[in-house]
Amino acid sequence: MTTLTAQQIACVYAWLAQLFSRELDDEQLTQIASAQMAEWFSLLKSEPPLTAAVNGLENSIATLTVRDDARLELAADFCGLFLMTDKQAALPYASAYKQDEQEIKRLLVEAGMETSGNFNEPADHLAIYPELLSHLHFSLGEGTVPARRIDGLRQKTLTALREWLPEFAARCRQYDRFGFYAALSQLLLVLVECDYQKR
């Protein structure tokens, strides 16, 4: 990636972490279909590797906005995909994909972070990874911690996430009937791959 700043990448990661952490409320639903988000999506599409994923997300948002009771339908999608058994779902936990659930805890400790008491999910929940990556990208811009240390931790986090994110995204595509979370997971997957290649 060349045109997005570390702070812009951090914002995308933080936004994705928020959307994967809980069901969307009415305010978030209005926001994702707003003109302000359309401008943000245009900026993201200026990064060629992200263009197709952002287009897919915009299409899923357009489809979502014409659904009756969109928030309730999206809540049902969230519940069906992320909170049910793994037979026809995409569980958002590293441990569901036979990954070491302790790895993210070690990475958080190394970054001087911990999970919030307000987040009632295990530490290996998907939302924790982009939240950590957001923190690391913001830290790169601040210059208070040596860039080499931050970059090493960023690479470890990306490597850990790449172990299971492709399967998670594939399961989202397979089981997300309306496609919003499938598109969201595809954007995260492409962003992670671009970020990883930027070694």
Swiss-Prot record:
GO terms for biological process: protein complex oligomerization; protein folding. It comes from the Bacteria. It is found in: Cytoplasm. Keywords: Chaperone, Cytoplasm. GO terms for cellular component: cytoplasm. Pfam families: Nitrate_red_del. InterPro entries: Chaperone_TorD, DMSO/NO3_reduct_chaperone, HscB_C_sf, TorD-like_sf, TorD/DmsD_chaperones. Involved in the biogenesis of TorA. Acts on TorA before the insertion of the molybdenum cofactor and, as a result, probably favors a conformation of the apoenzyme that is competent for acquiring the cofactor. Belongs to the TorD/DmsD family. TorD subfamily. PANTHER family: CHAPERONE PROTEIN TORD, CHAPERONE PROTEIN YCDY. This is Chaperone protein TorD. It comes from Escherichia coli O6:H1 (strain CFT073 / ATCC 700928 / UPEC).
